[in-house]
Amino acid sequence: MASMAAAIAASRSAVMSGNRPLDDRERKRFTYFSSLSPMARKIMQDKEKIREKYGPEWARLPPAQQDEIIDRCLVGPRAPAAAADAGDVRDPARFPGLRGPTGQKLVRFGDEDITWQDEHSAPFSWETRSQMEFSISSLSIQEPSAATVTSDARSLAKAPQGTQGSKPAQSSRSSSLDALGPARKEEEAPFWKINAERSREGPEAEFQSLTPSQIKSMEKGEKVLPACYRQEPTTKDREAKPVPQEQQTLPSVSAEQEVPQPVQAPASLLPKATPTESPEKPPPPAVQRDEDDDALFSEPALAQISSSNVLLKTGFDFLDNW
């Protein structure tokens, strides 16, 4: 309201001081634009000063000349000169865009001769041009000509039979590799089934503790006895194992017996015995053989005792290393 009152007061003062009174339309225009903002009020006051400066001649001037006088008085002569000296200001460097025509359709506007090219009418595809132009046929091996076929046939005829026999073997190997895929899946199916049964806990679990060898036997369809029904190796089996080792030790003993004994010199040539201590005699071969047998019998028993305390491995490294 304060700005409106100030605009009305300014318009009244301008009318009172002017050479000619403002009509009703000019007064409303001045009041409206002066009430918009302080900058607009300042512009309207400057225009009134210019009009007062020219006096009664202002009304006789054409509107274009009035606008030119207002621009020259408000802006000043320096601003157009500075703009002219700047020359052609080029567009700043920005990201390059596609400047060519992208559309394939001409749009006509009604009956008038107005046409423009629709930039959104190009064919759309999720693939790029290089992907659409790519084809496997360009990478395929071209078929050899008849001359090359005949030369290959001649070279094969000259080649030895060994090389000809190796080619069917390679083809059979490739066919076996191709057939390995479904067979591998059929082998893995019972394995995962058994593994799922092992993961079940409680009395419902059928396979509470299985070793990798038992899993393999179950995959083959064989029945596996629980750990409680498995028999421990008897003492006869333990005695049967070191027999080959004992046979290996016997030739060494016989070789020692075959070594020729040194010929004893006559007693007259031997020096007199001194009271020094006699060297220790090696034990007879029979006693040494018994000790070796005891050591051989004791080693498997210790190995079995130590293996019973070790937890069985599952065969999966990522589970055993936890």
Curated annotation (Swiss-Prot):
Residues annotated with Phosphoserine modification: 37, 130, 176
Source organism per UniProt: Mus musculus (Mouse)
GO CC annotations on file: cytosol
A Pfam family assignment: DUF4706
PANTHER family with a match to the protein in the record: SIMILAR TO RIKEN CDNA 2310022B05
Comp. bias (Low complexity): 1-17
Modified positions (N-acetylalanine) in chain numbering: 2
The name this protein goes by in its record: Uncharacterized protein C1orf198 homolog
Annotated spans, Disordered: 1-22, 81-104, 142-301
Superkingdom of origin: Eukaryota
Subcellular location: Cytoplasm
Listed Basic and acidic residues bias regions: 183-203
Polar residues biased stretches: 142-153, 161-177, 245-255
